[in-house]
Amino acid sequence: MDLLLGIVQGLTEFLPISSSGHLTLLSHLLKTDLNAYQTAVLHLGTLVSVVLFALDGIRRSLRSWRIILNLIVSTIPAGVFGVLFEKQIDQLFSSPRFLPLFFSATALILMFTRYSSSGEKRMENMSFLDALLVGIAQLFALFPGISRSGITVSSLLFMKYRSEDALQYSFLMSIPVVLGAGILGLGKGNVTILAPIFAFLSGLFALYVLSRSVRSGKIWQFSYYCLFVAILSYLAG
């Protein structure tokens, strides 16, 4: 079970297909009780992999006070909403009822990127308004079925940021969110140390695939898979 959870978490955390949605669906199909706190513990494994992949972005942010301030602004919406509605969000992980809707929404967002070409804006010059908007977009990823990487990268592409900067900023945004969720989840789940290790290894592979798909402008192709999972979750419900 640890192997399965770790691989599913690692692959789906960074591919734009929603890790929380897949874990919720998997929990329902296997008749296991996997709540939001337990998925948060799995995030600790993927956190290490994203830090390794985001080293360039981390170096850039350390040289730019604007990036650091923008990351704080981008983190606030999801952080505040997650604290205020913690119980309600946790309840969404116990039922696949809304998964078809949320997976379909992710598919639609990804499909639109097919018609949005990469721009020239860089994260060093990001406005506070853009930082807030992408932070609000990340807020929706608290719902299982909405992909965090999918909605944040897509939002930045829609705002005409370079594909490389959209990737790096999305990676940087995930670090405080995943770290905070993982710390909250420590000691509250029954996931062993093996699951985060498997999540780390599969997360590295997923990050490589995501990077190639965004840089080649083919992230929209994941929309077909999200539609498939939306149908599957509807049938499973």
From Swiss-Prot:
Chief place of localization: membrane
GO molecular function terms noted in the UniProt entry: undecaprenyl-diphosphatase activity
Record's catalysed reaction(s): di-trans,octa-cis-undecaprenyl diphosphate + H2O = di-trans,octa-cis-undecaprenyl phosphate + phosphate + H(+)
Disulfide bonds: none
Membrane topology: Multi-pass membrane protein
Single biological process term from Gene Ontology: peptidoglycan biosynthetic process
Alphabetical keyword list: Antibiotic resistance, Cell inner membrane, Cell membrane, Cell shape, Cell wall biogenesis/degradation, Hydrolase, Membrane, Peptidoglycan synthesis, Transmembrane, Transmembrane helix
Keyword Cell inner membrane: yes
TM stretches of this protein: 38-58, 65-85, 92-112, 126-146, 166-186, 191-211, 217-237
Compartments, record wording: Cell inner membrane
One Gene Ontology term, aspect cellular component: plasma membrane
InterPro entries hit by this protein: UppP
Enzyme Commission code(s) on record: 3.6.1.27
Annotated family: Belongs to the UppP family.
Additional remarks: Bacitracin is thought to be involved in the inhibition of peptidoglycan synthesis by sequestering undecaprenyl diphosphate, thereby reducing the pool of lipid carrier available.
Its biological purpose: Catalyzes the dephosphorylation of undecaprenyl diphosphate (UPP). Confers resistance to bacitracin.
Protein name: Undecaprenyl-diphosphatase
Encoding gene (name): uppP
